[in-house]
Amino acid sequence: RDAADLRYDEWEYTRRLEVDEASQGQIGYVHLRAMGGGNVTEWYRDFYPVFNRQGLIVDVRHNRGGNIDSWILEKLMRRAWFYWQPRVGRTTWNMQWAFRGHMVVLVDEWTASDGEAFAEGFRRLGLGQVIGTRTWGGEIWLTSSNVLVDRGIVTAAEFGVFGPEG
């Protein structure tokens, strides 16, 4: 790992600590730097320890995209519909790991591609508020199959994106 990755990790970690301290442990924080298959591990690592808090911040600022927006949205859409209360211990509920609190998503001008799709899906599905600045604006599927003679790559829009209204 290079120094830039380590600085980014520190930035992410300090955001998590700040949220935890400012909310006295009542709000969880999950940052996803991208939406690739490898980022599923980050989701598991960061979401499950905070799934039972009163609030959740999902930070997709600087998100480079990928293709797991639907997978994460599915996890956030889960709803508990009944509960178990043991004589001793904590209440549990069906739809294990269903988040039951308030949620927001943070975006910025560096939120790109599938990070934008995630934020738009979050908003359209009524999961919570999207907060931040206008995103990158490239919520399109790109292809990198256009390899040049010098082995460089030209990315070009391959699929446009639109909502149910057209």
Regions found by a protein language model. Give the residues of each.
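Short, small/polar residue-rich loop motifs at catalytic or cofactor-binding pockets
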Residues: T155
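C-terminal regions of proteins
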Residues: L148, E158-G160
